[in-house]
């Protein structure tokens, strides 16, 4: 089995066809076909089902790709780590960040990171755990920073608490309920949530129930944070978001918090990464920059392993 064959299989799996994979790899399509056929003969199994509109993995192919992706990621990391330890500034860092992490930790980290590693490609994924779990396991994602999930990470991953968090209610500036001071005052409001926040609808409903209030009326459910912000700025909708959103200057002219008296808890912000394997120097530097910029008012613990 050759390294190039693993690379070829992963490329086809990611792009869904020989033609697209060959274009991505800058290979002739017959050469790519020959590479896959040779590997399938060596393994004695079909890795793909050939269809008119492309190729899909067989169950055995899916298992192979999981392992091959991890190997490719480790080779990339090894190459990056050696170069960076030797004083080089090239490579790639892939970080999965929640909205709270984007707003609270990323802004202060970007400039010093780019100054230290100007040629490292930084790939930022907006998401949350556990949707990023597969990438963390196979090494295609270096680390995650975002809300702690109710389920503990997989055994091969390690979790570190960065800070405790809270939420706020926000709406457009000039909102009719801008002077509300309790959730009860907001009982008749209409709400919006976004699917990029884990369990947003469920947590909003549970919060109202805890205070003896009927479930809030969910009028708009968006697939992106941008859609939600546009909806908020152009309607009387409300939403509940991490308190870090108040630090996002581009929103301040259009949206404002509604300071209700109730404490609105939010999941702790954590980082998740693979256990037993060090990050590359560039990835570790970025994560350390984020640690240094943890909100000072937060109850932070010093790098425990959970």
Predicted feature descriptions by range:
Residues 10-31:
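Short helix-boundary/capping micro-motifs
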Residues 40-59:
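A short LG(V/I)-centered, amphipathic sequence patch enriched
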Residues 53, 83-102, 116-120, 164-166, ...:
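Interdomain hinge and pocket-entrance segments immediately C-terminal to HTH DNA-binding domains
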Residues 90-151:
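Central regulatory/effector-binding core of bacterial HTH transcription factors
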Residues 147-148, 177-181, 189-211, 279-288, ...:
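Secondary-structure junction motif
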Residues 156-191, 195-196, 274:
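Flexible hinge/capping segments at coil-to-helix
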Residues 202, 229, 243-256, 262-306:
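C-terminal effector-binding regulatory domain of bacterial HTH transcription factors
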């Amino acid at each position: 089995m050759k390294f190039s064959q693993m690379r070829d299989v992963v490329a086809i799996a990611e792009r869904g066809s020989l033609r697209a994979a060959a274009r991505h790899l800058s290979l002739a399509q017959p050469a790519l076909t020959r590479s896959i056929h040779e590997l399938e003969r060596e393994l004695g199994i079909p890795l793909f089902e050939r269809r008119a509109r492309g190729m899909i993995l067989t169950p055995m192919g899916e298992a192979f790709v999981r392992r091959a992706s991890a190997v490719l990621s480790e080779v990339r990391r090894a190459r990056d780590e050696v170069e960076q330890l030797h004083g080089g500034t090239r490579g790639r860092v892939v970080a999965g960040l929640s909205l709270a992490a984007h707003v609270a930790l990323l802004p202060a980290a970007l400039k010093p990171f780019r100054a230290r590693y100007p040629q490292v490609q930084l790939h930022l994924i907006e998401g949350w755990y556990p949707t990023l779990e597969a990438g963390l396991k196979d090494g295609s994602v270096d680390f995650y920073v975002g809300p702690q999930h109710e389920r503990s990470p997989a055994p091969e991953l390690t979790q570190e608490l960065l800070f405790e968090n809270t939420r706020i209610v926000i709406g457009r500036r000039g909102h009719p309920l801008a002077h509300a001071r309790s959730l009860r005052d907001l009982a008749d409001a209409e709400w919006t949530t976004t699917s990029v926040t884990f369990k947003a609808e469920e947590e909003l409903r549970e919060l109202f129930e805890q205070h003896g209030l009927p479930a809030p009326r969910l009028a708009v459910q968006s697939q992106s944070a941008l859609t939600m912000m546009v909806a908020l700025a152009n309607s009387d909708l409300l939403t509940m978001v991490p308190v870090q959103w108040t630090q996002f200057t581009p929103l301040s002219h259009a949206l404002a918090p509604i300071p209700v008296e109730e404490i609105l808890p939010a999941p702790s912000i954590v980082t998740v990464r693979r256990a037993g394997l060090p990050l590359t120097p560039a990835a570790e530097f970025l994560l350390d920059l984020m640690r240094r910029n943890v909100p000072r008012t937060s109850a932070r613990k010093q790098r425990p392993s959970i």
